[in-house]
């Protein structure tokens, strides 16, 4: 590679740019610049040529046109090894530009502001910057292009080692980074503007351009032989595992993040009082609402103490010292997450240095719609997040549920949304007493829920049952009645609904149809 002799620098993020430009000047590199960047460099005592002087054409249209000129893009795109290109450049007085340092108008930071208007957003769509980046990246055989301040030092070190040049291998890697950056930038613009078409999140575009940034590299994925990283959605604001602040503990693993998400999203369903959700392998093994956070935890733990070992615990209220102490004294726990953590609770958990303690902030009662993605070989499935609870509540049996049964039914129904299908949840008094998850047969899930309750020493008699989908046969009802279930909530919609309802009537059970299924795979 030839020595770098001319650089064009125009940056919104000015991190490290002064030191970088000073070292370039030390190599005798001519510096071209625009606007605020030129002023910053010049005020620091560096020799700078304005791009308008380089092109012989002034900036115009309130700065919208600065670098969109053949002398700039000819200097970037001209191939130094192509005699025709070299002759054309010479004929038109186009001088080569060997290095481009550009980062873009802060579109995402602008639209993240609550007061941002459409006009504000439009004015922060960079045109000249991406154009220069793409031109330089296309001609990476001859041009070095930098979009990330983290790359300044490695490039300077390479120039020092080579007498002022940068290798083609480095240029190629930097060019790839540019196209990743401009794709993300355009995606952010597309997504923000697209949300204002009137169709919003319900619209499924021909091309999905959701943008995620890498937040964490992991030692391994779901299993030790799998690599993994955690990417977070750009501009996400709602309290979530992606936005949570880790107060202490080991680095979150792949499985920690997946399970913490399941626990937190489940506990968000309960606004009526202090609630606790304990999750193991993405399934709730204990859920309860109590008069205090400690009571909620005690009751959730009582559902399935065996499965709670090594679990993830989520709360919907500030974690207090008494609850933290009960957890640390009683069980091994991987992660605890809550909207807030009291200083006293933080001190208690600090005695268990490996416990990952997360603070996620509060969330609105009504969650915003968003998209769920599932990877399949060769594509992704995209759907609306399952935020609704039911379409209707219709009693279909002769017996009406009592007031307490209806409360228990709605509690169990909310839990069932977060249990892997086929899902059966037994509940009583605002706590789960048995959870049957992930079975291929619905009646087997019901049997497992009963076994779990018996194993935990909990009384099933007088409890209610929630099923995430309809009962295809009456056997699930017969099985539930045999262990003491008195009321059932399910979507309905089976060809044999009449047979299932008749079974409930035979057993004197109340049954409520919701008109809404909650499969979870």
From Swiss-Prot:
| UniProtKB keywords | Hydrolase, Multifunctional enzyme, Purine biosynthesis, Transferase
Disulphide bonds annotated for this chain are none
**E.C. numbers:** 2.1.2.3, 3.5.4.10
Offer one example of a GO biological process linked to this entry.
'de novo' IMP biosynthetic process
Mention any Pfam family matching this sequence: AICARFT_IMPCHas
Check the record and name the InterPro entries matching this protein: AICAR_Tfase_dup_dom_sf (IPR024051), Cytidine_deaminase-like (IPR016193), MGS-like_dom (IPR011607), MGS-like_dom_sf (IPR036914), PurH-like (IPR002695)
- Which chemical reaction does it catalyze? (6R)-10-formyltetrahydrofolate + 5-amino-1-(5-phospho-beta-D-ribosyl)imidazole-4-carboxamide = 5-formamido-1-(5-phospho-D-ribosyl)imidazole-4-carboxamide + (6S)-5,6,7,8-tetrahydrofolate; IMP + H2O = 5-formamido-1-(5-phospho-D-ribosyl)imidazole-4-carboxamide
Q: What would be one Gene Ontology cellular-component term for the protein?
A: cytosol
The chain positions of domain MGS-like read: 1-147
Q: Which SUPFAM superfamilies match?
A: Cytidine deaminase-like, Methylglyoxal synthase-like
Q: In which pathway does it act?
A: Purine metabolism; IMP biosynthesis via de novo pathway; 5-formamido-1-(5-phospho-D-ribosyl)imidazole-4-carboxamide from 5-amino-1-(5-phospho-D-ribosyl)imidazole-4-carboxamide (10-formyl THF route): step 1/1; Purine metabolism; IMP biosynthesis via de novo pathway; IMP from 5-formamido-1-(5-phospho-D-ribosyl)imidazole-4-carboxamide: step 1/1
* GO terms, molecular function: IMP cyclohydrolase activity; phosphoribosylaminoimidazolecarboxamide formyltransferase activity
Alphabetized PROSITE patterns for the sequence: MGS
HAMAP family attached to this UniProt entry: PurH (MF_00139)
Q: What is known of its domains?
A: The IMP cyclohydrolase activity resides in the N-terminal region.
The family assignment reads: Belongs to the PurH family.
* Protein name, entry field: Bifunctional purine biosynthesis protein PurH
């Amino acid at each position: 590679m030839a020595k770098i002799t001319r650089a064009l620098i125009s940056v919104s993020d000015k991190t490290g740019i002064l030191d970088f430009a000073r070292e370039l000047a030390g190599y005798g590199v001519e510096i071209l610049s625009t606007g605020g960047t030129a002023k910053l460099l010049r005020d620091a005592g560096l020799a700078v040529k304005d791009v308008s002087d380089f092109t012989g054409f002034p900036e115009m249209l309130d700065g919208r046109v600065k670098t969109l000129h053949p002398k700039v893009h000819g200097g970037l795109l001209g191939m130094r090894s192509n005699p025709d290109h070299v002759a054309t450049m010479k004929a038109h007085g186009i001088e080569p530009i060997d290095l481009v340092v550009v980062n873009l108008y802060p579109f995402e930071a602008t639209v993240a502001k609550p007061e941002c208007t459409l006009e504000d957003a439009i004015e922060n769509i960079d045109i000249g910057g991406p154009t220069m980046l793409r031109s330089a990246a296309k001609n990476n055989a001859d041009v070095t292009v930098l979009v990330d301040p983290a790359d300044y030092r490695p490039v300077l070190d390479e120039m020092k080692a080579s007498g002022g040049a940068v290798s083609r291998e480095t240029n190629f890697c930097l060019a790839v980074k540019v196209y990743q950056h401009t794709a993300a930038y355009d995606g952010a613009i597309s997504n923000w503007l697209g949300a204002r078409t009137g169709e919003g999140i319900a619209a499924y575009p021909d091309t999905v351009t959701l943008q995620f940034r890498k937040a964490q590299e992991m030692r391994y994925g779901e299993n030790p032989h799998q690599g993994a990283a955690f990417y977070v959605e750009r501009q996400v604001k709602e309290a979530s595992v992606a936005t949570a602040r880790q107060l202490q503990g080991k680095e979150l693993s792949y499985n920690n993040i997946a399970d913490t998400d399941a626990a937190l999203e489940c506990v968000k369903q309960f606004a009526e009082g202090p609630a606790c959700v304990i999750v193991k392998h993405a399934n709730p093994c204990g859920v309860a609402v109590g008069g205090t956070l400690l009571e909620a935890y005690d009751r959730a733990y009582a559902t399935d103490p065996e499965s709670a070992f090594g679990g993830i615990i989520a709360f919907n209220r500030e974690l207090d010292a008494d609850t933290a102490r009960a957890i640390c004294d009683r069980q091994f726990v991987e992660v605890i997450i809550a909207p807030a953590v009291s200083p006293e609770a933080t001190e208690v958990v600090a005695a268990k240095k490996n416990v990952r303690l997360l603070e996620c902030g509060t969330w609105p009662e009504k969650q915003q719609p968003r998209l769920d993605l599932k990877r399949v070989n060769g594509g992704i499935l995209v759907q609306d997040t399952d935020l609704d609870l039911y379409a209707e509540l219709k009693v279909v049996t002769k017996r009406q549920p009592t007031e307490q049964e209806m409360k228990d039914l709605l509690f169990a129904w909310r839990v069932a949304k977060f249990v892997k299908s086929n899902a059966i949840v037994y509940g009583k008094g605002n706590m789960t007493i048995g959870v049957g998850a992930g079975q291929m047969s619905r009646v087997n899930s019901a049997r497992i829920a009963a076994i779990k309750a018996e194993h935990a020493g909990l009384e099933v008699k007088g409890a209610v049952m929630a099923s995430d989908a309809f009962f295809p046969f009456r056997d699930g009802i017969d099985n539930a009645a045999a262990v003491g279930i008195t009321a059932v909530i399910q979507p309905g919609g089976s060809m044999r609904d009449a047979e299932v309802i008749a079974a409930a009537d035979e057993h004197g059970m109340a049954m409520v149809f919701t008109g809404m299924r909650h499969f979870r795979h």
